[in-house]
C-alpha cells in the first residue's frame, strides 16, 4: 500500500455519501507498498480501506480484482470485501482516480515471521488456490516472461546505477527462463504477491490475506515459489530450510504438489526472483522523489536469484522427496 494521490476531506465526505458507510471521523494515508494510494478511514460505522487505483493498474482489470475478493470470501477464505455503493456498483471515482471502499481486516503483518507462521501461509495459499477454482473471470499474468522482457528493456540502460555488469547477467537469465519455463503444470487463480505485508495475523493465527491487485491466472506452483522467496530467506540472504519445509508442508496439507511441479520449483523460483528484481529495479529508477512510498531494494532479489541458480535438487527447499 502507498499514497501517490492526495485527497481533500470535503471530496472524501462527498464520496462517502454514495455508500452506506457512515460519517467520516478521520482518515490517514498508508505508506507501505508501491502500487495504489491507500487510506485508512474511521467512520461512525466500521473502519474501511479506501483505495485509489493509480495508472499502473488497468481500470479494465478492476472487475476481476474486486470480483475475485467476493468469490474467495464466499468460499470461506478470509480476505477483504469490496463495499458496494448505493447503486450496487463496486467502483467509484475520487480525485480523478477509480476508487473503491474495502472492508478492514483485523490483524497485523509480521515483521519477523517464524516457521510456524510459514506453515500457516502455505496452508492459506493452497486454500486460496482451491477456493479460486470456478471463478469465471480471467486475467493473464502481465508480469510473466513477456512482461519481464518489457520491464528489462525499460530499465536496462540505467541498470548499472544499481550494480555494475547487470546487463549481461539479466539478459542471460531471461534467455534461460524463456527456454526452460514449464508450460503444462496445473494452473488457476494465483495471488502473485503474497509477501508478509499482505498476510495478517492475530497472535500466531493467520487472520486473512489482503492486496489481490496482482492476482491472475498462472501456474499454481509459481505462486508457491513466490512465497518461498518472500518468506523463507533471512535478512543476511540465507535460505532458511526450516521455514521452507514448514511452508511446503502447510501447502501440501491442503493441495499436494505433483511430481512435475516439484521438479519445476528451481526454475519457477528463479523466475519469481527475477520478476521481483525487475519490478523493484524499475521502481527504484523511476519512482518520483517526494512520493509517500517505500522503495524496496532490488539487489535483495538479485541475491535470491543467484541462490536458486545453485540449486541441484528441489529437496534443497525443504521437500521430502
Curated annotation (Swiss-Prot):
Known catalytic reactions: L-homoserine + ATP = O-phospho-L-homoserine + ADP + H(+)
Class in the EC hierarchy, top level: transferase
Keyword Kinase among UniProt keywords: yes
Keywords for this protein: Amino-acid biosynthesis, ATP-binding, Kinase, Nucleotide-binding, Threonine biosynthesis, Transferase
SUPFAM superfamilies referenced in this protein's UniProt entry, alphabetically: Protein kinase-like (PK-like)
Superkingdom of the source species: Bacteria
Residues that span the membrane, as ranges: none
This enzyme's EC code(s): 2.7.1.39
GO MF term list: ATP binding; homoserine kinase activity
PANTHER family the record matches: AMINOGLYCOSIDE PHOSPHOTRANSFERASE DOMAIN-CONTAINING PROTEIN, AMINOGLYCOSIDE PHOSPHOTRANSFERASE DOMAIN-CONTAINING PROTEIN-RELATED
Family, similarity comment: Belongs to the pseudomonas-type ThrB family.
Name used for this protein in its record: Homoserine kinase
The species this protein was found in: Rhizobium leguminosarum bv. trifolii (strain WSM2304)
Amino acid at each position: 500500500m502507498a499514497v501517490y494521490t492526495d485527497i481533500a476531506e470535503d471530496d472524501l465526505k462527498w464520496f462517502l455519501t454514495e455508500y452506506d458507510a457512515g460519517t467520516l471521523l478521520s482518515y490517514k494515508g498508508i505508506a507501505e507498498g508501491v502500487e495504489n494510494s491507500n487510506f485508512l478511514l474511521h467512520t461512525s460505522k466500521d473502519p474501511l480501506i479506501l483505495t485509489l487505483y493509480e495508472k499502473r493498474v488497468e481500470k479494465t482489470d478492476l472487475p476481476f480484482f474486486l470480483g475475485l475478493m467476493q468469490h474467495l470470501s464466499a468460499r470461506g477464505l478470509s480476505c477483504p470485501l469490496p463495499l458496494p455503493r448505493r447503486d450496487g456498483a463496486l467502483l467509484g471515482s475520487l480525485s480523478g482516480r477509480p476508487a473503491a471502499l474495502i472492508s478492514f481486516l483485523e490483524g497485523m503483518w509480521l515483521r519477523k515471521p517464524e516457521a510456524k507462521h510459514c506453515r500457516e501461509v502455505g496452508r492459506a495459499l493452497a486454500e486460496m488456490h482451491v477456493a479460486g477454482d470456478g471463478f469465471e473471470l480471467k486475467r493473464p499474468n502481465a508480469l510473466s516472461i513477456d512482461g519481464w522482457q518489457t520491464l528489462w528493456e525499460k530499465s536496462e540502460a540505467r541498470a548499472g546505477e544499481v550494480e555494475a555488469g547487470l546487463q549481461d547477467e539479466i539478459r542471460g537469465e531471461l534467455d534461460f527462463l524463456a527456454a526452460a519455463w514449464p508450460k503444462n503444470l496445473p494452473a488457476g487463480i494465483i495471488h502473485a504477491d503474497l509477501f508478509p505485508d499482505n498476510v495478517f495475523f492475530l497472535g500466531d493465527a493467520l487472520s486473512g490475506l489482503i492486496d489481490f491487485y496482482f492476482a491472475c491466472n498462472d501456474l499454481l506452483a509459481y505462486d508457491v515459489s513466490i512465497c518461498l522467496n518472500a518468506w523463507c530467506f533471512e535478512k543476511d540472504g540465507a535460505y532458511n530450510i526450516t521455514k521452507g519445509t514448514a511452508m511446503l508442508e502447510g501447502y501440501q496439507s491442503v493441495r499436494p504438489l505433483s511430481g512435475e511441479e516439484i521438479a519445476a520449483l528451481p526454475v519457477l523460483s528463479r523466475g519469481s526472483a527475477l520478476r521481483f528484481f525487475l519490478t523493484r529495479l524499475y521502481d527504484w529508477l523511476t519512482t518520483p522523489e517526494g512520493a509517500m512510498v517505500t522503495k524496496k531494494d532490488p539487489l535483495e532479489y538479485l541475491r535470491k536469484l543467484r541462490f536458486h541458480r545453485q540449486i541441484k535438487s528441489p529437496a534443497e527447499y525443504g521437500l521430502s522427496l
